[in-house]
């Protein structure tokens, strides 16, 4: 029988690898895991309670908000904010920063997308939570402000995501590899199921919404055409796999190899995905697993942000596939 390792125990064991660790980051990650359990409880009951459908409001991005978006957002803020470990938080659903009720001793910043892919929830397609953790830039939590949120992705101390699908899986990194945990509802715990995840150097799948093809720039069209061409030497053609839920598409490609593409378009010249709580955390995870993430011209983790809800194009996944995407976007092919 395989040894069962809970997520809490794994956090503690990882902490021992760092002689300077105080245990604070371990507590933060466990808070996130606890919040994920609360969201999971409602996601699996979504068809039985009145949290499907639209909430009748729009978020700061101008997107229609689902009832479950609001529920997940509130649960995460309340579950994590009450412990005083975060001085500041930022969410896709809130225009400005969020000051937790007990932030006097907080030394960290949490940025998150409470329910990525929520447009799929009504039809029972996988959705997820994405999160990113930074240290405060100063020592005084009472002086924390938006600038503490606007750090480069390379400054992240932890990042992760939770997928609510046929099973519930939490994947995270603290910069020392990538680990995945599957939720066991019979004991109410996340158990280690994917240790030291590494992504293939080259994949065989590409994920993109080709329904927007007419909006793509020529460089993106040429890249997609390249992936479809037959060439046994380079393993082409690739197959399309696109769910429409960023975290689910990314997770599949992370495990099996492939590239996820959400490019700049004629309509959205700066891209559409959010840098701070979608692209950055996934880029951190991807690089830790041996992959690559870029906006087409610059490494995602090197982008200097100017606003909380900043958007970016995203090419992320297997290293060789992303390098070729960069070459097309930069006119080298």
Swiss-Prot record:
Q: In which pathway does it act?
A: Carbohydrate biosynthesis; Calvin cycle
For this protein, what does the record note about how its cofactor is bound? Binds 2 magnesium ions per subunit.
Which keywords accompany this UniProt record?
Calvin cycle, Carbohydrate metabolism, Cytoplasm, Hydrolase, Magnesium, Metal-binding
Which residues participate in Mg(2+) 2 binding? 113, 116, 278
GO MF term set? fructose 1,6-bisphosphate 1-phosphatase activity; magnesium ion binding
What Pfam families does this protein map onto? FBPase, FBPase_C
| Binding residues annotated for substrate, in chain numbering | 116-119, 209, 242, 272
Going by the record, the broad EC class of this enzyme is hydrolase
Disulfide bridge partners, by residue number: none
Could you say which EC number(s) this protein's record lists?
Answer: 3.1.3.11
Q: Where in the cell? A: Cytoplasm
- Oxidoreductase: is it a keyword of this entry? no
- This protein's major location comes to cytoplasm
Catalytic activity, reaction form: beta-D-fructose 1,6-bisphosphate + H2O = beta-D-fructose 6-phosphate + phosphate
Q: What are the record's GO terms for cellular component?
A: cytosol
Instruction: Name any cofactors this protein relies on.
Output: Mg(2+)
Give GO terms for biological process: fructose 1,6-bisphosphate metabolic process; fructose 6-phosphate metabolic process; fructose metabolic process; gluconeogenesis; reductive pentose-phosphate cycle; sucrose biosynthetic process
The entry marks the following residues as binding Mg(2+) 1, namely: 92, 113, 115
* Subunit structure, as described in the record: Homotetramer.
Q: Which family does it belong to?
A: Belongs to the FBPase class 1 family.
* The protein's name: Fructose-1,6-bisphosphatase class 1
């Amino acid at each position: 029988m395989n040894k069962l390792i809970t997520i809490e125990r794994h956090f503690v064991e990882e902490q021992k690898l760092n002689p300077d660790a105080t245990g604070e980051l371990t507590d933060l990650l466990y808070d996130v895991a606890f919040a994920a359990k609360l969201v999971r409880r409602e996601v699996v009951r979504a068809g039985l309670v009145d949290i499907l459908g639209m909430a009748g409001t729009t978020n700061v991005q101008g997107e229609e908000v689902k009832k479950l978006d609001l529920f997940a957002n509130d649960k995460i803020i309340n579950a994590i904010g009450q412990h005083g470990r975060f001085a500041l938080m930022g969410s896709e659903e809130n225009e400005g920063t969020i000051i937790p009720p007990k932030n006097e001793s907080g030394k960290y910043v949490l940025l998150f997308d409470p329910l990525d892919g929520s447009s799929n929830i009504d039809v029972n397609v996988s959705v997820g939570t994405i999160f990113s953790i930074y240290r405060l830039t100063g020592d005084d939590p009472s002086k924390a402000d938006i600038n503490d949120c606007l750090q480069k992705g390379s400054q992240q101390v932890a990042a992760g995501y939770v997928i609510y699908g046929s099973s519930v899986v939490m994947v995270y990194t603290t910069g020392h590899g990538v680990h995945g945990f599957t939720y066991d509802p019979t004991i109410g715990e996340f158990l280690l199921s994917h240790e030291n995840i590494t992504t293939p150097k080259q994949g065989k799948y590409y994920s993109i919404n080709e329904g927007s093809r007419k909006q793509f720039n020529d460089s993106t069209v040429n890249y997609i055409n390249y992936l479809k061409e037959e060439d046994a030497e380079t393993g082409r053609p690739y197959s399309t796999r696109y769910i429409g839920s960023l975290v689910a598409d990314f997770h599949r490609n992370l495990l099996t190899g492939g590239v996820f593409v959400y490019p700049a378009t004629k309509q959205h010249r700066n891209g559409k995905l959010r840098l701070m709580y979608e692209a950055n955390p996934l880029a951190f995870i991807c690089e830790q697993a041996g992959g690559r993430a870029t906006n087409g011209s610059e490494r995602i983790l090197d982008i200097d942000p100017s606003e909380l809800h900043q958007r970016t194009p995203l090419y992320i996944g297997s290293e060789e596939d992303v390098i070729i995407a960069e070459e097309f976007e930069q006119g080298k092919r």
